Amino acid sequence: MSRVYVGNLDPRVTERELEDEFRAFGVVRSVWVARRPPGYAFLDFEDPRDARDAIRALDGKNGWRVEQSHNRGERGGGGRGGDRGGGGGGRGGRGGSDLKCYECGETGHFARECRNRGGTGRRRSKSRSRTPPRYRRSPSYGRRSYSPRARSPPPPRRRSPSPPPARGRSYSRSPPPYRAREEVPYANGNGLKERRRSRS
C-alpha cells in the first residue's frame, strides 16, 4: 500500500470528490481530508504503481501538489506511508501501530472510520457557512426616487374690483333744513312792518 499526499486543496473539497479523481488510476483504500487546518489530504492506494501514476498525472492539476508521502510527521500522518508501502496491513490489520485516527488520536482505525468523526469538524464547517448575508435585500428607500414632485404654481389671486368713484353728486343726501328769513332788527323796533310797507 502506498500513501499519496495532496496539498493546496480548496477547503471546500470533499473526500468523495478526491476519491472520484484518484480512483481512475487504481484502487483507493482510504481518503482523509484535513479540516483543522484545511488545505491538504492523504490517500492510500492499494498498489504503489497506481499511486505513482496518479502523482505523475495529477501533480499541478487544479493547483494541487501531489507527491509520495514521506515522513510528514504525526499531525498529517504522512510519515507512515513509507512504512506501510509493502505491508498488507490494510483494514484487516487494525492492531498495527501505523493505524492511527487523526480525528480522535486513537490507534486501530482510520479517520474515515472514526465514530467520533462528524462532531467538531462538521459543526465547525457548518458554523463557517452560516455567515450572515450582507446587504442582500436592497433597502426600501432605494426603490423610491427622491426627485421632487413637480408642483403647479398656485393660481393668481383675484382681487374684487373696487367700485368706481361717483362722478355726480349723490342725491341721497337730505336737503338742508329750511331756514326762515331772518328779521333784521332796526333801531326803531318796527323793522318788519316797515319792510313790508316798503315792498307794497
UniProtKB/Swiss-Prot annotation:
Gene3D superfamilies: 3.30.70.330, Zinc finger, CCHC-type
Cell compartments where the protein resides: Nucleus speckle; Nucleus, Nucleolus; Nucleus, Nucleoplasm; Cytoplasm
Modified residues (Phosphoserine): S138, S147, S152, S160, S162, S174, S200
PROSITE patterns recorded: RRM (PS50102), ZF_CCHC (PS50158)
Compositionally biased region (Pro residues): 151-166
A GO molecular-function descriptor: zinc ion binding
Gene Ontology terms: cellular component: cytoplasm; nuclear speck; nucleolus; plasma membrane; spliceosomal complex
Bias kind Basic residues: ranges: 120-137
Annotated consequence of substituting C101S: No effect on cellular localization
InterPro entries: Nucleotide-bd_a/b_plait_sf (IPR012677), RBD_domain_sf (IPR035979), RRM_dom (IPR000504), SRSF (IPR050907), Znf_CCHC (IPR001878), Znf_CCHC_sf (IPR036875)
Pfam family, one: RRM_1
Biased composition (Basic and acidic residues): 62-83
Annotated Low complexity bias: 138-150
SMART domains cross-referenced by the UniProt entry: RRM, ZnF_C2HC
Keywords: Cytoplasm, Metal-binding, mRNA processing, mRNA splicing, Nucleus, Phosphoprotein, Spliceosome, Zinc, Zinc-finger
Region described as Disordered: 62-97, 112-200
Residue ranges annotated for the RRM domain, each copy included: 2-71
Role this protein plays: Sequence-specific RNA-binding protein probably involved in pre-mRNA splicing. In vitro, can complement efficiently splicing-deficient mammalian SRSF7-depleted HeLa cell extract.
The family this protein is said to belong to: Belongs to the splicing factor SR family. RSZ subfamily.
SUBUNIT field: Component of the spliceosome. Interacts with AFC2, RS2Z33 and RNU1.
Protein known as: Serine/arginine-rich splicing factor RSZ22
Lineage: Eukaryota, Viridiplantae, Streptophyta, Embryophyta, Tracheophyta
